[in-house]
Amino acid sequence: MDSKIIKYILLFIFIFSFEAKSIEFNGKFIQGHFILGKTDPGAKIIIDDKEIKVTEDGYFVFGLDRDRKNDVVIFKTLNGNKTKIVKKVIKREYKIQRIDGLEPKKVTPPKEVYARIKKENKLIVRAREINSNLKFFKNKFISPLDDAIITGIYGSQRILNGKPRSPHYGIDFAGKLGTPIKAMANGVVTLAKNDLYYTGATLIFDHGHGTVSYTHLTLPTTPYV
């Protein structure tokens, strides 16, 4: 083989390798996980055919669905060069709890509260869909309670009287009544309600780029810094 061709191939491999390595991922590609990415400033990132916000210093964030099965396809474009990265998603086992013999009213809410539930769900969805330019998602997240007891885990699901309920999309922490609760990271409060039907005293924080944290408490609360 001509030496010039060999040099060209080696150069192409070097450039492709450099482009691929210029994206760093902090987080595991497991169902339900949160991934923080770092790329070159000015790069364009597309994940699953959707362009993702990237900060001016190259940070971006995305999450994997609870039941995602297909690979994650990532395209990076910089200075006219396009790089494709494919990541396999690892399957995760979730806890399933079956409870039978419950009174129907404890499984399905009464019709007179349907309108209230629908209205409150819209408030929550609106707050969770905010995709601001805040950059707090880059910071380390902390536990909202010190020495907390975990009573509910992400992805778990209950089947009540044979009817599957929505999976649990968070982590429940238990503490003594009146214990101060910390925000998990810097952010802006986008929803503060004291008496929602399903979640009681509820706070939603926006950390930027579609990243939100969500708390529901026993007692009414006022966020403060």
Predicted feature residues:
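Sec-dependent signal peptide recognition
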Residues: S3-L11
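Hydrophobic h-region of N-terminal signal peptides that target proteins for export
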Residues: F12-A20
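Cationic-aromatic interfacial patches
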Residues: S22-V86, K91-R92
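Short, acidic, Ser/Thr-enriched surface-loop or helix-capping motifs
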Residues: T55, M184, H207
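Surface-exposed, glycine-biased beta-strand/turn segments
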Residues: V86-T199
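His/acidic/aromatic-lined binding-pocket segments of jelly-roll/cupin-type domains
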Residues: P180-K182, L203, S213-Y214
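Short histidine-centered loop motifs in beta-beta connectors
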Residues: H207-L217
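Single conserved hydrophobic/aromatic residue that forms the stacking wall/gate
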Residues: H216-V225
